[in-house]
Amino acid sequence: MHQKILLASGDSFTDPKFFSGDKSIDRKLRGGWPMWPELLGKELNLKVINTADSGRGNDYIAKQVLDKIYEYGDQIDTCVIVWSNADRHDFHDKKKNLINIPHDLLSIWGKKKPIHRIQLNILARSYSELFSEEGENKFWENLLNESFRYMWLVAEACAKYNIKFIFRQGVVLLDYNLWNEIYEEGLICDDYQLKEVDYYALCDTNKYALMLDKHYKKNIVYPFWEYDNSIASITDKNSNKLTISKTDRHPNAQGQVMMSRFLHAALANVS
């Protein structure tokens, strides 16, 4: 009898290839440890398929998971997703390489610390220029709706194949404080300012978010778009033990163990 599958996905909190860019610390402390899917798979005695990739957005995560559900169907016992930011977008370049803009928002405007900076390219510059043009006042509504729609589609696919699943946020769904910082520095126009009250209003009234809460309450933590319900809120509170360094807040080896235990406990509530 074939071993059943744990299907996992996410961004750098989940990516087995993750390696910290903080060169100020020993290489042994920058990566190479088992990530939570590997640890959780051993606990559950499941074969692990992990589609996570650092810096990816929720569209990438959902597409990878949906493809695996289509491929393996009821061979999948459990699906656990640690979702990413809503404002990360995937594109294909002329050579069909999958690239992501923005991996780190402030790097588009060249304002981030060198450890986080990505090389500016034509696509990044073109993307940043869009935010100086007025007229797209439904940008945030459409962006958030896209993430919620993908979450709903994955939940429905899991339900169809009787796959046990849970969703959690790794980082906060959308860092409106960061976008306000960009706005205050005059780098984007008024139409792209995102106030806290507007962010919560958009999330609270989104039809897909409401359906997730209605039909899959045990599988999610509602409201899952709040920082306090993210895994980052746990690692940040215990940063000395659970994160890589002062400049890199990704979970370290101990942080990955914490994530595995946290997600294992969450799965017990949907059994």
Give the location of each predicted region.
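Alpha-helical cap/lid subdomain in secreted, periplasmic
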Residues: 66-253, 257-271
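Serine-esterase "nucleophile elbow" of acetyl-processing enzymes
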Residues: 1-66, 71, 258
